[in-house]
Curated annotation (Swiss-Prot):
PANTHER family: PHOSPHATIDYLETHANOLAMINE-BINDING PROTEIN (PTHR11362), PHOSPHATIDYLETHANOLAMINE-BINDING PROTEIN 4 (PTHR11362:SF82). This is Putative phosphatidylethanolamine-binding protein. Belongs to the phosphatidylethanolamine-binding protein family. GO terms for molecular function: lipid binding. The keyword Transmembrane helix does not apply. InterPro entries: PEBP, PEBP-like_sf, PEBP_euk, Phosphatidylethanolamine-bd_CS. Keywords: Lipid-binding. It comes from Plasmodium falciparum. The keyword Methyltransferase does not apply.
């Protein structure tokens, strides 16, 4: 596991598409693996098969400090395509209240699943999509009260395309006094 460098983030245009500038201080390494050992690793290309269910294992290089917890976001900044990302960041999954260095099958004691997992569903011909995993720190008392996220009322009623007009994890982090501390991504083509 290694933390992505600013030059890596610029090369794959994570900066400016996910983070607006290089004023990002990533210090928590993030390891993600799906079924059959498919690992997310700094923009590697994965086949969409096997990403339909929650990642089997997510590891962090460290635990959050006392009084804080991690919030894990999984988003697609290339929705509906990288050339025309009109939907801004499509939200695939949000889990809050993570207090340990490992999340097995998407949960652990005291975690709050704010938005249940929805795997990538990418239309053919839209090119590679950068599926992004973002870790932020939030005060533990605020773990289930994050402003700007859509409210989950069952799959039939949810619109995941928008962060209630806040457009991105970066903006959600700012309005909720969260600090983004970790990032990893893969690319998936429909």
């Amino acid at each position: 596991m290694t933390i992505p460098t600013i030059s890596e983030l610029k090369k794959d245009r994570i900066i400016p598409h996910v983070f607006p500038n290089d004023k990002i201080d990533l210090n928590v390494d993030l390891f993600i693996s799906f079924k059959a050992g498919k690992e997310v690793n700094h923009g590697n290309v994965l086949d969409i098969a096997g990403t339909g269910s929650v990642p089997r294992n997510i590891k962090f290089s460290e635990e959050p400090p006392d009084g804080y917890c991690f919030v894990l976001f999984m988003v697609d900044p290339d929705y509906p395509s990288r050339l025309r990302p009109d939907g801004k960041e499509y939200i695939h999954w949000v889990v809050s209240g993570i207090k340990t260095k490992e999340l097995i099958k998407g949960t652990q004691k005291n975690c709050v699943t704010i938005l249940p997992y929805v795997g990538p569903s990418i239309k053919k011909g839209t090119g590679l999509h950068r599926i992004s995993f973002i870790i932020s720190l939030i005060k533990e008392e605020d773990k289930d009260n994050i402003t700007g996220l859509p409210h989950y009322k069952g799959e039939k009623y949810i619109t995941r395309v928008k962060f209630n007009n806040y457009e991105s994890v970066h903006n959600i982090a700012q309005i909720n006094n969260m600090k983004i501390v970790g990032y990893n991504w893969c690319q998936i083509e429909g």
